[in-house]
Amino acid sequence: MNITNVRIRRVDNKDSSSKLLAYVTVTFDDCLVLHNIRVIRGQKGVFIVMPNRRTKIGEYKDIVHPINQSFREILQSAIFKEYVKENPSNFELELV
């Protein structure tokens, strides 16, 4: 499965303490689209959060997620590459 498109929707944070940097939509093989991946700045660096839902007991469960580390790295790399391309001076890439 190949990533054929990555679209970044930056979040303009007026509050500098906000951790959310962007929402991402990824297209696979021009036939499957995954919406609402989030780019988050945490204490240890920047990472992606897959689309999730809050359960009745308050836990968050991923709706969809990579099942192995190598694909997660491919996905994260494609997202960060596009983010940096669109925001070269606004992003210090320190991955978690």
Curated annotation (Swiss-Prot):
Sorted alphabetically, the keyword list is: Cell cycle, Cell division, Septation
List GO BP terms, alphabetically.
Answer: division septum assembly; sporulation resulting in formation of a cellular spore
Q: Which family does it belong to?
A: Belongs to the SpoVG family.
Q: Which NCBIfam families match?
A: PRK13259.1 (NF009749)
Q: What the protein does?
A: Could be involved in septation.
In terms of HAMAP family, this protein maps to: SpoVG
Q: What is this protein called?
A: Putative septation protein SpoVG
Taxonomically, what lineage is the organism?
Bacteria, Pseudomonadati, Spirochaetota, Spirochaetia, Spirochaetales
